[in-house]
A protein has these predicted regions:
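N-terminal export signals
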Residues: 5-21
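C-terminal active-site subregion of NodB/CE4 polysaccharide deacetylases
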Residues: 20-22, 29-133, 140-142, 178, ...
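Histidine-centered divalent metal-coordination motifs
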Residues: 73, 190, 194
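Acidic (Asp/Glu)-rich catalytic clusters
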Residues: 147-152, 172-188
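Glycine-enriched alpha-helix->loop->beta-strand junction motifs that scaffold or abut catalytic
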Residues: 153-155, 183-184, 245-248
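A short, conserved beta-to-alpha structural element at the edge of catalytic cores
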Residues: 155-174
Length: 288
């Protein structure tokens, strides 16, 4: 794939080693007389240790950042009151299904967020034409519309809910997050209440960055290591707080990745519902 800068509109505001040794062994030979047993054969192979993978340099991570990442928001039909901008990021269910079919017909294989980050950081293998599907904000339609279609296609995806809205009407519940997680989907954080991270001060860092990770970890029973920035906006100060909070990687939208910390500024594009199949495939090839 060839890289080029792709500027995407920001998201709509929402109301969230192990070591393996080859041990020496001794095999005894039984005797029926008083003569001493023959010497026991002993393995001469030295113990082996499986070293943990070595993280790539920032330059290596940037060079691997050619996997397309798509960002979706609400999955529902448009309404008369929807603004022109809202219509660019609200995907009708029929269009969503057509987009998934295009991805399949194009030979792409959706991967998990963890698999993509492993590839970027360590160079682990991915399918021939990988793509990452992400869903921001925590809308209930991610479960009611998105999950069944993803399951029907056999696709994996990553969901980034804001934690303030969990359990509220029309938003994802904790039980639904657990079900998505058990199905092999990735769950990441999207702040507490969708504040821009480039405007956070003081205790807001704890509320918006640290606490959502802790809550999602508690809900799922395992660490949550990924996050997505509301509106796709980030700052140098935010990168330090994201690292300190324990996140492994973070996703923005269309800006260039930070050359020093590319894992914390992974790019995504938002496919508008007006894109037909060829346009979607062309952008998967050209935008990364």
């Amino acid at each position: 794939m060839r890289r080029r800068q792709f500027l995407a509109a920001a998201a709509a505001a929402a109301l969230a080693g192990c070591s393996r040794g080859t041990a020496s062994f001794t095999r005894s030979v039984g005797t029926t007389s008083g003569s001493p047993p023959p010497p026991s054969p002993t393995s001469s192979a030295p113990p082996t240790t499986s070293a943990p993978p070595t993280p790539g340099t920032a330059q290596e991570i940037l060079a691997r950042s050619t996997v397309p990442v798509l960002c979706f928001h609400q999955l529902r039909d448009h309404r008369p009151e929807d603004s022109d901008y809202a219509r660019t990021i609200i995907t009708p269910p029929s269009v969503f299904t057509a987009q998934l079919q295009t991805i399949r017909d194009g030979g792409y294989t959706p991967v998990t967020g963890e698999a993509l980050v492993d590839h970027l950081e360590f160079g682990t293998a991915l399918p021939a034409k990988p793509v990452l599907l992400t869903f921001d904000d925590g809308w209930g339609t991610h479960y009611s519309v998105g999950f069944p279609e993803l399951t029907r296609f056999g696709f994996k995806a990553t969901f980034f809910p804001q934690t303030m809205v969990l359990g509220a009407q029309n938003w994802l519940s904790e039980d639904q997050l657990r079900e998505l997680d058990r199905a092999g989907m990735t769950i990441g954080a999207h702040t507490f209440d969708h504040k821009r991270v480039d405007r956070l001060v003081g205790d807001q860092w704890r509320v918006e960055i640290d606490e959502p990770r802790a809550r999602l970890t508690g809900i799922l029973g395992h660490p949550v290591d990924l996050m997505a920035y509301p509106y796709g906006v980030w700052s140098q100060e935010a990168l330090g707080h994201v690292t300190a909070a324990g996140y492994r990687a973070a996703f923005q939208l269309g800006d260039a990745q930070d050359p020093a910390q590319p894992l914390l500024t992974i790019r995504r594009i938002m496919p508008p519902p007006t894109w037909d199949g060829p346009t979607l495939l062309a952008n998967l090839e050209s935008a990364f």
